Amino acid sequence: MAYTGQTIHNPVSGERIEFLRTAADTDGELLEFELELAADGRVPGAHVHPEQEERFHVLEGTMTFRLGLRKIVATAGESVVVPAGRMHKFANGGAETARVRVEVVPALDMEELLCTTAELAHEGKVMRSGMPKPVHLALFVRRFRREVRAPFPPAPVVQALLAPLAALARARGHAARYSATPAMA
């Protein structure tokens, strides 16, 4: 579990995250963190948070968001809200590091998801795109199914297809989650 003031870094995506308020701080109501995204930083691809709303408040720099087919460019002082269930992705839209305050409502296990992605990146268990390698993706998708899913194919199809690979990964000693002390910045 993450703690307030903890900072993690994902060297593949270019994300540096400082947890401001965790699920424990807010009784699960929200997770709040400050995201610094390097000039070439981006999330691995389009995704959906089935049960969570994400609120992005740009503090410095420029961010580019895709919400469905809609492109939004947000600069310092602007906010973008992604409703639960909405396909989206984001990237730094400028030449300088962007700084964004992010709120995720409700928190669920999003902080654990973020810590896990950082650890996977540090351990070389992700592809160049930032997506976990298949064996780790199978575990990740099953573990964090309330927090994130691919926009297509339908979630039940993905779960069914990855179940055998997840079982194999567990049999080989791989974990779906990582320690409470993830890659520090």
Question: What function would you assign to each model-found segment?
Answer:
Residues 1-30, 41-52, 57, 62-185:
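Jelly-roll (double-stranded beta-helix
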